């Protein structure tokens, strides 16, 4: 079993993106589904689907590429780790990479992107960044 399922999921997405794979499989967890949903709304992935095979759930993620075959993901990083939690106030969530990137934040309103957390006037735990 994986100790940090978020870091494992981000690594699987990063590796699949570097290998130019169309689809990758992630372990199922509610937090991972929430993060992948943010990636989808921001256009970093095409789509995702939760599979239930023999009682074991997994998440199939379709990666997004442009017409030239370049990945929509340039960099994906874990910010808050199990040994070192990182929290961001609302004022620290305004912009990331001049608006090209997104910080995924776990707030009291759920797992959202940094711009949505800023508009909702909440801060929270910065889970990962992507651009």
UniProtKB/Swiss-Prot annotation:
Taxonomic lineage from the root: Bacteria, Pseudomonadati, Campylobacterota, Epsilonproteobacteria, Campylobacterales
NCBIfam families: PRK00136.1 (NF001109)
Encoding gene per record: rpsH
Pfam families reported in the protein's UniProt record: Ribosomal_S8 (PF00410)
GO cellular component, one term: ribosome
Provenance organism: Helicobacter hepaticus (strain ATCC 51449 / 3B1)
Disulfide bonds: none
Domain of life, source organism: Bacteria
InterPro entries: Ribosomal_uS8 (IPR000630), Ribosomal_uS8_CS (IPR047863), Ribosomal_uS8_sf (IPR035987)
Keywords per UniProt: Ribonucleoprotein, Ribosomal protein, RNA-binding, rRNA-binding
Name listed for the protein in its UniProt record: Small ribosomal subunit protein uS8
GO molecular-function terms, A-Z: rRNA binding; structural constituent of ribosome
Gene3D superfamilies: 3.30.1370.30, 3.30.1490.10
HAMAP family, per database record: Ribosomal_uS8_B
Example GO biological process: translation
Family in the record: Belongs to the universal ribosomal protein uS8 family.
Assembly: Part of the 30S ribosomal subunit. Contacts proteins S5 and S12.
Function: One of the primary rRNA binding proteins, it binds directly to 16S rRNA central domain where it helps coordinate assembly of the platform of the 30S subunit.
């Amino acid at each position: 079993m994986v100790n940090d399922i978020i870091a494992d999921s981000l690594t699987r997405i990063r590796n699949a993106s570097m290998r130019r794979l169309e689809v990758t499989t992630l372990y199922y967890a509610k937090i991972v589904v929430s993060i992948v949903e943010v990636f989808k709304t921001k256009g970093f992935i095409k789509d995702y689907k939760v599979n239930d095979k023999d009682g074991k759930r997994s998440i199939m993620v379709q990666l997004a590429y442009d017409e030239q075959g370049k990945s929509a993901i340039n960099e994906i990083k874990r910010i808050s780790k199990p040994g070192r939690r990182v929290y961001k106030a609302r004022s620290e969530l305004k912009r990331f990479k001049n608006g090209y990137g997104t910080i995924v934040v776990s707030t009291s309103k759920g797992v959202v992107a940094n711009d949505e957390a800023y508009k909702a006037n909440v801060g929270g735990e910065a889970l990962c960044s992507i651009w």
